[in-house]
């Protein structure tokens, strides 16, 4: 893999969908924060599994079943290593949403009581809001929010003030905002939460695809993320957890594979991580996720971060040229990931996205599963461009050119 002196990546050919044309024009995919495109190595790994190794795992003693189990558990080991985690504290879930719900259910219902506080931030995805709302409604605990400043950042002073009250039982926060692009200082936040005697959870859905992640260095109690945003398949997510916390937790779901013994009136539980993986696993998806982290590891996440930082800086500079366009979030690329939300004055974001689609420029428009943040920002919705390792400056130029045409079409309101 060759790079330029600016650490740009040249991997577009690895992604089959990037060769697609619509109406004779190339696809400009700028919605990686919603889901990433998949390299051919991921597609082939899943195809190869189904063609040559398909069997259920953790059950059969015949060679095909053992081969499937080895592929699945080998993928788990590589996923754990990719994020600096231990294999047996790396739990496969359906997605990041399920991983967070697992914590809310299996940990929260044992530890959170009336009078306690669950602390989250105004920038959270609904997946890191609604499970805590449900928990607080059930237990009588209070849900509080850290404010988002006008520049899209959080205040650690406010975090300290909330923790000083002594009632915070759990704090949950995004590694990278899916709307603002803000990169939060999650290691520092987790350290302050632990010092106050509380538990922390990081939603890494946008962090793992964009940044080098070492869950040991971050040192949160839980770190949740999803495969499909990190070049992997849909249908699989990951929860990394602290061993002593996971061992003390009750299971999330009941059924096969998560048990050690079952009697007529009671059961005993399997070891980690299988205690939290009831039923037949997402085997092909696990194999695909293993291939995805192999691909990212081969690229080197430092290079991925450098590429997206440079592309984001270029995009911020180019977007500043578009009349009546306002970028929302941190002002420079150093403080944000490869996510840029914006509004074009007088034009609804959905109209912007529809017009860009005519040029095959794919962006997201809406509340981005972050309605409370939209209220904080005072907007009903935003348009959002987000980048992956396959994007280039030419994609940004196409975005800006298309936005200029949209601006000309609607005129100044």
What role is predicted for each listed range?
Residues 1-413:
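Pyridoxal 5′-phosphate
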């Amino acid at each position: 893999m060759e790079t330029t002196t600016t650490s740009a990546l040249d991997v577009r050919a690895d992604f089959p969908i990037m060769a697609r044309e619509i109406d004779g024009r190339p696809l400009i995919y700028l919605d990686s924060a919603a889901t990433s495109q998949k390299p051919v190595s991921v597609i082939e790994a899943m195809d190869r599994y189904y063609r040559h190794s398909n069997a259920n795992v953790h059950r059969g003693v015949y060679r095909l079943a053992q081969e499937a189990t080895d592929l699945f558990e080998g993928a788990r080991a590589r996923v754990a290593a990719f994020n600096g985690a231990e294999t047996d504290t790396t739990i496969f879930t359906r997605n990041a949403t399920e991983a967070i719900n697992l914590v809310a259910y299996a940990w929260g219902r044992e530890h959170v009581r009336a009078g306690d506080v669950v602390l989250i931030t105004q920038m959270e995805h609904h997946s890191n809001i609604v499970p805590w709302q449900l928990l607080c409604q059930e237990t009588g605990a209070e849900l509080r929010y850290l404010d988002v400043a006008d520049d899209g950042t959080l205040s650690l002073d406010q975090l300290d003030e909330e923790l000083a009250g002594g009632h915070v039982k759990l704090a949950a926060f995004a590694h990278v905002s899916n709307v603002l692009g803000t990169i939060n200082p999650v290691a520092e936040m987790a350290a302050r939460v632990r010092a106050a005697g509380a538990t922390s959870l990081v939603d890494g859905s946008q962090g793992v695809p964009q940044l080098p992640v070492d869950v040991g260095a971050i040192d949160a109690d839980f770190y949740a993320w999803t495969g499909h945003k990190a070049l992997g398949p849909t249908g699989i997510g990951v929860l990394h957890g602290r061993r002593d916390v996971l061992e003390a937790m009750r299971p999330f779901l009941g059924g096969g594979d998560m048990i050690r013994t079952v009697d007529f009136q009671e059961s005993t539980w399997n070891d980690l991580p299988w205690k939290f993986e009831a039923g037949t696993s997402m085997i092909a998806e696990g194999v695909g996720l293993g291939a995805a982290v192999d691909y990212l590891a081969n690229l080197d996440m430092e290079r991925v971060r450098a590429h997206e930082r440079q592309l984001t800086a270029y995009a911020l500079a180019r977007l500043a040229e578009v009349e009546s366009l306002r970028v929302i979030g941190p002002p420079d690329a150093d403080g944000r990931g490869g996510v840029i939300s914006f509004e074009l004055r007088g034009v609804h974001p959905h109209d912007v996205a529809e017009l860009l689609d005519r040029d095959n420029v794919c962006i997201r428009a809406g509340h981005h599963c972050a309605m409370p943040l939209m209220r904080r920002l005072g907007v009903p919705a935003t348009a959002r461009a987000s980048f992956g390792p396959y994007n280039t400056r030419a994609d940004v130029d196409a975005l800006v050119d298309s936005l200029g045409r949209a601006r000309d079409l609607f005129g100044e309101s």
